């Protein structure tokens, strides 16, 4: 498993029962505050963070359940034309989506 994938998973685990979110800049994971009114089931990144970092890659987590990308996640990723990752905590699974390559799945990211 790549160091980047492991770093994304570890950043997501720090948020416990809330959806973690942030950006990837180069090989660096940048955790951000989830400003959603319902952070246990959704994530929202402050628009000012997008302007500050100008990211190409966004990550977030699904702390409960075994679902990967939601339809909403894919719609946002497609509209923003960014690469999105979702870490499915209970399954130790990382999914990557881009409009060019579709979805790629990485199992057992942390080997737990």
Each model region followed by its residue ranges:
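Conserved beta-strand-loop surface patch within small alpha/beta domains used
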Residues: 1-55, 64-112
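Conserved catalytic cores of phosphodiester-cleaving nucleases, focusing on short active-site segments
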Residues: 57-59
């Amino acid at each position: 498993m790549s160091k980047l994938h492991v770093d994304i998973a570890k950043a997501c685990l720090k948020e416990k029962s809330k959806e973690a979110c942030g950006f990837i800049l180069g090989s660096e994971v940048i955790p951000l505050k989830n400003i959603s009114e319902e952070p246990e089931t959704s994530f929202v990144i402050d628009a000012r963070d997008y302007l500050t970092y100008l990211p190409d890659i966004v990550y977030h987590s699904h702390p409960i359940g075994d679902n990967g990308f939601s339809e909403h996640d894919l719609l946002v990723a497609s509209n923003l034309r960014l690469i999105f990752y979702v870490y499915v905590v209970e399954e130790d699974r990382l999914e990557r989506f881009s409009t060019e390559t579709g979805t790629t799945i990485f199992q057992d990211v942390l080997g737990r």
